[in-house]
Amino acid sequence: KRQVPAPTNTPDDAGPYITLGMCYATHPDTGVHDVTIHRLCIQGKDELSIFFTPGARHIGAMAERAEELGQKLPISISIGVDPAIEIGSCFEAPTTPLGYDELSVAGALRNEPVELCKCLTVNEMAIANAEYVIEGEVIPNVRVQEDQNSHTGYAMPEFPGYTGPASSQCWL
């Protein structure tokens, strides 16, 4: 049995969260790839919910397009990466347009490219030097209540110091 470190920070949290997971996916039409950070709440043994800020995250747009095509979106979640990759992954619209590879920001900060490797169970890439990687698929036409297991009404504490509401539109 393997366990993943996923803290529940306060009694109001929706559940245990994987923090600073670098989500990596490829656009189903264009082949353009991207890396972003998202709220990842453990919902069950083999299920994570992922919150895409509407209109603001590139992988959210990729998941929406895959859903339009009736396809699952393969995704890797790399945890424990170089801080330059975490910084680069924070560049989102409108700073960087859809199709811009934020890993190039990380590469510029590091003065060397970010190495990728093939996933073992899904057709996607992952950050090669991560401490560990979770592989999976974003499922089309399925949304879950973020706090479906705790019913607290909240998600998790955010960096500005507040706890936001749980989303009813998290992807699985």
Identify what each model region corresponds to.
Residues 1-172:
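Extended, highly charged
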